[in-house]
Design a protein with these regions (language model features):
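Short cysteine-rich clusters marking metal-coordination/redox-active sites
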Residues: 33, 322, 427, 441-444
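Radical SAM enzyme [4Fe-4S]-AdoMet core and its adjacent flexible, acidic
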Residues: 1-2, 114-118, 123-125, 130-262, ...
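Accessory C-terminal segments flanking Radical SAM cores
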Residues: 237-359
Length: 481
């Protein structure tokens, strides 16, 4: 592999190799986060033993897993966490970890590095007041940055994760500057989702129309970060198909774009009691495929319906706006986790930039409102209603939770539905993706071929100009390649 081990090859995709596992090794946690989907705090009553954990590591290795990310709760609160790290590395897999950092001491970080841990991510969800409020412990912000400093000193790669709530949007630029100063190399952002304690605090959730503010800001920060050697990475529930998809999805490779939820295709989640899911964030009640105490990992991966939810998924399963969307056959409604916890079923995703843009063009927007509380168990969710209203917030029409097809003047896709992957083309006029064979862009009305030719010509001229500059400069002046 020339890139990070979790990067997928065409062979990985075709073979459904479980490349990346995210493993909650304990539910015990020293924070009290208001947006925690798993409601972490106390350990699960029947967490895997050390030997069961080590055996699962070996099973994952045999199935072709290349990276395991340890999470909690807090992974370091499990007494044998270092032993698990060592076994992962001995089995030839990469080992990374995500933490809130509250009690991630210098000694713990050094021990993890000595055991073979390669990268350590710290979750920081706002500036000091916002972060400490969300994390439920005063001083957690300072502890997180202290951990970042120790990670750097011990030679581990450091990353930061941020849950985007309604509170943090105005703070994102300042946060990025702080992360860069702290030595972090990358920053993953994802939308806070209505699961667990976040479902108890719906005021933290973004409204779908707020993507119109968020997405341009993230695009600006991506470009600013890239200029400073810092990578902003959108999580899998940040999207989809607006004018910025080509900017960040492929980390600079504009041929890369969202191609549907990967849960159970090349990723999986493991709960501390041995429950296996296609994604660590999916609700246990609906998406648990089985437990390694009852079945081998290989059996769970290949034979359970819950792990196969996305392998043969077609656009026939979509509904609402997503059911008639231009990108339905490719996108398949984005993140399964985000949609299933809102409405109790996947397939209609209001957190979509393309969707927000299309509605905005008609003076409309969508808003969610909670109609059913979450029961209070790990990875639980309530139920939300989707309301279509005028862009100024005045009433327009109320959508029921089923059969709420939104008819808009969005460009229509072909009527034939298929699960085969389409290779989309990037319009060089508006930088939105279009279907192969499209002659006139349905979004900007530009001529796709003419725009591509003009772009290629400009690129050739820019390269020639750069080469002339290199030839004219004195030899002692450095140039950037």
């Amino acid at each position: 592999m020339t890139g990070p081990t979790r990067y997928l090859s065409s062979r990985d995709r075709a073979a459904f190799t479980p490349v990346h596992a995210v493993w909650e090794i304990t539910l015990a946690c020293d924070l009290k986060c208001h947006h925690c989907g798993s409601r972490a705090g106390k350990r699960r009553p029947d967490e895997l033993t050390t030997e069961e954990c080590l055996d699962l590591v070996r099973q994952l290795a045999r199935m072709g897993t290349r990276e395991i990310t340890l999470i909690g709760g807090e992974a370091y609160l499990r007494r044998d966490w270092l032993e698990i790290i060592r076994e992962i590395r001995e089995q030839g897999m990469d080992c990374t970890m995500q933490s809130g950092g509250l009690n991630l001491t210098d000694e713990r970080i050094k021990a993890a590095a000595d055991a073979g841990l390669q990268a350590l991510g710290i979750s920081i969800d706002g500036l000091r007041d916002v972060h400490d409020r969300l994390r439920g412990v005063k001083g957690s912000f300072d502890a997180a940055f202290k951990a970042l400093d120790a990670i750097k000193r011990h030679g581990l790669s450091s990353t930061v994760n941020t849950q985007i709530t309604a509170l943090v949007i105005p703070q994102l630029r300042e946060l990025m500057n702080l992360f860069i100063e702290a030595g972090a190399k990358s920053w993953q952002v994802q939308l806070t989702v209505a699961m667990g304690r976040a479902a108890d605090n719906p005021e933290l959730l973004l409204q779908p129309y707020e993507l119109l503010e968020l997405m341009p800001l993230l695009a600006e920060l991506y470009e600013e970060g890239a200029d400073r050697g810092f990578l902003l990475q959108p999580g899998n529930n940040i999207g989809y198909y607006g004018p910025y998809e080509s900017v960040w999805r492929g980390n600079g490779d504009d041929r890369v774009y969202w191609t549907s939820c990967n849960a159970g295709q090349n990723t999986l989640g493991i709960e501390a009691d041995g429950t296996i899911k296609g994604c660590p964030s999916l609700s246990t009640s609906k998406y648990a495929g089985g437990n390694i105490r009852d079945l081998s990992f290989e059996e769970i991966w290949w034979t359970t319906d819950e792990l196969n939810i996305n392998r043969g998924r077609t656009s026939e399963e979509l509904w609402g706006f997503c059911g008639s969307c231009y990108y339905a056959d490719v996108c398949k409604a984005g993140c399964t986790w985000t949609t299933s916890v809102l409405f109790g079923r996947a397939g209609n995703n209001p957190y979509c930039h393309h969707r927000a843009l299309e509605l905005s063009k008609q003076g409309l927007r969508e808003r969610i409102t909670q109609v059913e509380q979450a029961p209070g168990t790990p990875f639980d969710h309530g139920r939300f209603e989707l309301i279509l209203e005028n862009a100024d917030g005045t009433p327009r029409a109320k959508l029921p939770l089923a059969n709420n097809l939104i008819q808009i003047s969005s460009p229509r896709r072909k009527t034939k539905r298929t699960s085969a992957r389409k290779e989309l083309v990037l319009c060089r006029g508006c930088y939105r993706h279009v279907m192969p064979g499209t002659k006139i862009c349905p979004f900007c009305q530009g001529n796709i071929r003419a725009l591509a030719n003009r772009y290629a010509k400009n690129l050739r001229e820019a390269k020639k100009a750069y080469q002339r500059l290199v030839e004219l400069l004195p030899p002692h002046i450095e140039t950037f390649q």
